[in-house]
Amino acid sequence: MLSRRSLLIASALAASAPTVMAQNIAAASESLTPVGKKVDLSKLPRRKVKLVAPPMVHPHTQVATHEPSVVQFEMTILEQEMEIDDNGTMLQGMTFDGSIPGPMMIVHEGDYVELMLINPPQNTMPHNIDFHAATGGLGGGALTLVSPGEHTVLRFKATRPGTFVYHCAPGGPMIPWHVVSGMSGAIMILPRDGLRDDKGKSVKHDKVFYIGENDFYIPRDANGDFIRYTDPGSAYGDTLEVMNGLIPTHVVFNGRVGSMTGENALQAAVGETVLLIHAQANRDTRPHLIGGHGDLVWETGKFNNPPLRDQETWFIRGGSAGCALYTFRQPGVYAYVNHNLIEAVNLGATAHIKVSGTWDNDLMEQVVAPSEYGDAHTSGKALP
């Protein structure tokens, strides 16, 4: 007799059967067997870390203060309806730990990442996780496919320092559908001696702001209104049709329009150095800090490569996470945007950073306040 797990996996694979990716995942899952000597990590210290919701990150040291260890995380997959704008538009979301993006994990190079991934029984479909930071097994995707009511534990060694995307990848068209339904996040693997600038000098940050950019594809009815569905499965067919048009209805930071604007703005102070981590699992994007810059930018997010200096706008390739370091020099509200301004202004890809402190007139000063254009110009008088 077929088990519930078998039926769920069969359904997912049947939907994705036409694609090579699904065939590869199925083949990998069937053919993987233990290879080589089992690794004994019993003498390594183990640390349990509680994940926190974006845009914050869990406490961490910037320079490793310990020998390599096994860092234990736990994430629960939640399928849930989520409001994605102030107009009441609803997404049948699929999430890691209930947030879009999923929480940031931070370890040091040489550590082992050990993740318990839980798929609760109230969910409706299989899920897994593909770490772009991991080596082998489709990033862990081939080893972590769990049906509702199951859990699994994956461990991999953090060998490459940088910021990396993770996402769900259950096979075929399920992959992009799960990703654009919210199932992506990021992990940061810090060098053991911390971050360094392009000249090799150690640099530190006071805060981390973690921004996950998502493109959503919400179907409309005959009147042009967004459709609200009862569960992810009922949304699948219509959503896939919109997805295949490659035109998102929403492009947002951290799960919804306005998630980090107005009263929800991020907070900083003049003199503080902030590490801005930006992840996009699906589409290219162009972060820009209006009123500021990227002092140091790891555009591809990989810390073995020297950072760029003094960037106005940087490029995050779809399927990657990059980061920028900036020290705020003026108070005020900064807009952090995707500089495809249509997506920033019309579709939602904007965040605000409110910075407190004292204004520096040497950096910028309003010489003449807005006034009627007249005598000061036509008389040829010099400006003060």
Residue ranges of each PLM-predicted region?
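Copper-binding active sites and cupredoxin-like electron-transfer domains
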Residues: 2-384
